Design a protein with these regions (language model features):
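Bacterial N-terminal signal peptides that target proteins for export
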Residues: 2-15
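N-terminal leader/linker segments that initiate helical-solenoid repeat arrays
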Residues: 26-79, 91
């Protein structure tokens, strides 16, 4: 009888422990939840801390605050970072450009566009890159104007990169004109802008538009053009995948430049595996 009683008591103890474990799993403690993710109040506190740092007299501290706000990837943090767009320091204004991106394109694009006319080259360049990261077609007109009119090659290159990041077909004509003017004019002033030309060629490939093939083939086929640009054109043609590019790519595959030859062969395999 005693043995039966002990067995029954053991059985009840097991049931009790099992029920307790299930309760803990179904209802985790507040401390356990706090380990999983920061509380709302902690996030708000951190945003407020960085907001206060934006009032510092030290430009480096203000820039660091913007970097931290941007790294939070929250709209509330990016909204606080908006004030940095009008900071007296170019370094801070440039840092604010990417810090506001968590607002989404509807808010960030209108906020960034004025910075593309900033007197400081670095600010214009960073705002162009940031506009590209919005992936918004609403930024194309501004970026196109920047590509065509800015006096600094670094800014124009950033605009071309940004147009590629957006990847909208509406930018093909402008990008093609940038590339073909250099491809058809030989030793022209534009040929010196190697980063602009490379960025334009790559951006054309990112649009995936067959309308870009003519300009890219012209660049690839022009032996007077800088090899880096021709290689980028070869790669872009592979990204588009139009068989119309195969003759030019096959010619480039026999180039004495091993890197151009390799890029052309890779694109040929992509188009005609």
């Amino acid at each position: 009888m005693q043995n039966l009683r002990r067995l029954f008591q053991t059985y009840l103890a097991v049931l009790f422990l099992t029920a307790g474990a299930l309760h803990v799993c179904a209802h985790p403690s507040a401390s356990a939840l706090s380990l999983q993710s920061p509380s709302r109040s902690a996030i708000e506190t951190e945003i407020e801390n960085q907001r206060q740092r934006l009032s510092s007299s030290d430009a480096e501290e203000r820039r660091d605050a913007l970097m931290k706000l941007g790294s939070m990837r929250r709209a509330a943090a990016s909204r606080v970072a908006l004030t940095g767009l009008s900071d007296a320091s170019p370094m801070v204004r440039a840092g604010a450009a990417k810090a506001i991106l968590s607002l989404g394109p509807e808010e960030s694009v209108p906020a960034l566009i004025p910075l593309t006319a900033d007197k400081d080259e670095f600010v214009r360049r960073e705002s162009a890159y940031a506009l590209g990261l919005t992936r918004s077609p609403k930024a194309i007109e501004t970026l196109t104007s920047l590509l065509l009119t800015d006096k600094e090659d670094g800014v124009r290159s950033a605009a071309a990169v940004a147009l590629g990041d957006i990847g909208d077909e509406s930018a093909v004509v402008t990008l093609s004109n940038i590339l073909t003017q250099s491809a058809t004019s030989g030793k022209s002033k534009k040929e010196k802008n190697i980063f602009v030309l490379r960025a334009a060629a790559k951006a054309l490939g990112q649009t995936k538009s067959k309308a870009a093939v003519t300009a890219l083939v012209a660049a690839l086929s022009n032996e007077k053009l800088v090899e880096d640009v021709r290689r980028e054109a070869a790669t872009a043609l592979g990204s588009i995948g139009d068989p119309a590019a195969l003759p030019a790519l096959r010619t480039a595959a026999s180039s004495a430049d091993p890197y151009l030859s390799q890029a052309a062969l890779a694109s040929i395999r992509h188009i005609a595996p």
